[in-house]
Every structure is written in C-alpha cells, then in structure tokens.
C-alpha cells in the first residue's frame, strides 16, 4: 500500500467506530458505575476532536508565521501544515478507531476512558515517521528526525483526550454528564503545539543533515521535487 493511503478520513474513523461499537443506547454500566458511552455520545466526541484539529491548523499557521517571520516561511507553511495535519490524522485514527495500534475502538473502548501515557510513543512511531518523510521526500534525514518524533505524540494525545472528554454523558440518562464548553479550544491548543513542534523538528533535521550529516542540498532538493508534497519545500530550502 502506498504510504499516503494510510491517512484515514473522519468519515472512515466514524464508520469504524460505528461498526465496532454498534448501536447500544448507553444504558449499560461499566467500572465506577459509569454509563457505557452510546454511539451518539461517541460520535459527538469524535466531532469534538475533528473540530479541534480544524482549529489547530489555523492556530499553528499563525504562530509559525510569527515565529519564523525572518525566514519567509509563508510560501511553504500552508502546504506543510496540511501535510502535518494529515500525519496527525494517522495518530487520531490509531487512537480513536484502533487503526494502527490495534483492533477494537482504540484507546477509549466503550466508556469515558483516557489515553494511556505510554501510547504517545507508539502513536508517533515508525509508520507515522515513514509516512511524513516519504510524502515530503525527506527519507534521507530520517536519522535526525525519527528520534525526536515520539515525544511530540504527547501533544496530540493530550489534545485528543481533552476534546474527547469534553462531552460526558447522554442527555436525560446520565445526571452527572455534561459538556465542558472550552474543551475543544483547549484541545486545539495542544494539537497546534504538536504541529509546531513537528515543523521545528523537520527544519532542524534538514539543517542537521546538511551540516553534521554532510548531506548535499541539491541532491536533497531533487528527492523532494520527486515526492508527492515536498517540491515547494525543496525550492524554499535552496533559497
């Protein structure tokens, strides 16, 4: 399978969750006497995560424009953030629908749930790094990029977790369940921070490859030119 075909859509994530959870009404109880999440509640939670991801793109783009104003990064930023957002979708699919990490409905199961801390590194592992380096034509910089990626997974998983838990309970069923009004905003900040850290890691890895790794900028630019999404970044690098 081509690397760019592993990025799930939100429709695919919802479809897999629907398939795995079924249409239970949320009447069963799980541990701590909580109600098992209904399909409707679970889909609301997915929509929270989706909204947080959409907002995070805008937040990260604005922040990076200010941070790297002296590098004239605007010409590559929109496409680069789009690629990074797709990479983060692999993480979201892994966590929410079990796409990469395992079967079932991901880390949350049927209940309220929370993401295990140890999942951060797994979610940002080899498949994720291979995908983004492949689509940008940056496989050559892998040794300077891969080790720094797992720690960034925590930003994405925190954001997903906050957005997910922003909806609690089904109306009329759980008297203690209510939506947290600022959860999506807080979640988007975490996800945006993840996007920013990936950009910084990528740019730093390119510099390290060309200096410590004694890589050739012209050769790297040609590799990026031949990739699905790296041509513009390669041209910018040569300026």
Where in this protein do the model-derived segments appear?
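Cationic, glycine-rich low-complexity segments
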Residues: 1-159, 216-219
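Short, Lys/Arg-enriched charge-dense amphipathic segments
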Residues: 99-106, 194, 235-238
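Short membrane-interface loop/juxtamembrane segments of multi-pass integral membrane proteins
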Residues: 163-189
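Hydrophobic, membrane-inserting alpha-helical segments
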Residues: 132-135, 139, 181-227
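Long, low-complexity intrinsically disordered regions
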Residues: 226-239
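Charge-rich, low-complexity amphipathic helices
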Residues: 99, 106, 110, 167, ...
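Generic structural motif recognizing short loop/turn segments at the entrances and edges of beta-strands
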Residues: 9, 26, 203, 232-234
